Amino acid sequence: MNDPHNNFDIDSLRVASEHGDCDASVRLGQLLLQRGGFGSSEFDEAITRLEQAAGMDHTEAQLLLANVLAQVHALPDADARAAHWYDAVAQKNHPEALARLGDMYLTGRGVAADDAQALARIERAARQCYPQLQCDLAYMLDHGIGCNADPVAATSWFLRALAQGSHQAAFALGLRYYCGRGVGRDAAVAQAMFECAAGGDFPDARVWRGRLDEITSSNEKSDARLLAQRIRDQVRSLPHQFAAAGISELDSGESATRKMTAVIERHWSALDDGRISLDPGHRGARGNATGWPVIAAPGLPQLEIWQPRVFRIPHFLSEYERAHVIALSAPRMAAAAEFSRDAAEFEKDFFTGTAARLGAHMCDPVIRNIERRIAVAAMLPARHIEPLSVLRYQDDDVYEAHVDYLTPDRLEGAHGGQRLVTFICYLRAPREGGETEYLNAEHAVAGEPGLALLHYNCLPDGQPDEMSLHASRPVIAGEKWLLRTAIHAQSLYEPIAAARDAT
């Protein structure tokens, strides 16, 4: 079937754009971007057309332009220009722009790094009743990103997201009620939350529901089933409450947000269960659990082998972080040759599973916090880290023997220079098989959930280490999910010319 976009008359759109039609400029920009990437004449014209409309305060053009610039790191001043246009849209209280600008403050791209500014932007977006952004805000509050850690406030924001049907929030709350993080421990409420999360197929929710089933009493099980059903019924009836209040999906602005917030709070309070009240004063006991399964507890890297240099870090990711990364990447899984143009020619010959790359537009506070943790473990700046990717191995899938350092032909002109260190972390470990094997060292590492491996692709003098040849053995039973990245010798977020000058 032909792409219907090709039926548009490019020349007519150009004429309309030149006469100041902002909608035409945006449509033309979209079509040109589909036809050519960075470095093409189509890309250059698309940027020009979008800048024209953005300069006329066209919100869609400003946001699209910012999204494009934020992903083209080789373009001079791209980050600063992206931040400028995100800020222009954020001043209109646009939730996506607020979230993306918050991300730039987290990374220090285009603006000075400032976690407090990031938190402020993401909170403004979350207050507009967006469950995903409420989960992002809760995570930041829980981890003290831009503030002092506040597990109680984090629990309240997760509950607000749950009140709107977020399965991610339900999973997070299951963990919190299980261990007592910002709320009193309550096995029945925890099991009810995992039941709600499992209803939306949120990763690992069924596993945790099964764990709770083994330790709860018959009365707690009955309480959990009843509470889960009441929560589901309440969420299903929320749209009717919005309709009764005269709120439609198209409503926006501060007035609509106030109305929606009032309806959500009133409707949730009708459950009349203090254990899950949005008001922390009504929730009673406040647990002070500080670690697993809600908060990651990685220790110092432990030596695995010297040749090649491989270090292991148990408990690198929390249960929530692992499930979140799987949920984020699962809908985008594709064969290796499809998910990354840069790696396709190299990777498709070695890897038989599927993968997803977490590009800038997919990154959130969880991903950025993981990147920071990786940077600390590798003792290299976060700006040297490749965008994270996720690999999924099913039955018999393998990653054949390969090295991760860039060979001379691939290193020439590579943005960021040599890949000094490879990082992998098990999101899920198979029941059998799937070990990471260092062939020249005749050493294999069996995976376990949350285990991270750092292996050095280069010797201390910077030369490639041929001992780093490694592979993944076939998965025999279960699935293997890996979070993966590489840390380069130089920043990946500098224009190409500037990066070359630095060398």
Each language-model region and where it sits:
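N-terminal leader/linker segments that initiate helical-solenoid repeat arrays
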Residues: 1-30
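Structural signature of tandem alpha-helical TPR/SEL1-like repeats
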Residues: 2-11, 38-49, 74-85, 112-121, ...
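Short helix-capping/linker turns of helical repeat alpha-solenoids
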Residues: 19-21, 35-36, 55-59, 71-73, ...
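Hydrophobic face of amphipathic alpha-helices that form TPR/SEL1-like repeat modules
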Residues: 27-35, 64-71, 100-107, 111, ...
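Ankyrin-repeat and related helical/solenoid repeat scaffolds used for protein-protein interactions
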Residues: 148-152, 156-208
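Fe(II)/2-oxoglutarate oxygenase catalytic core
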Residues: 195, 199, 206-453, 458-503
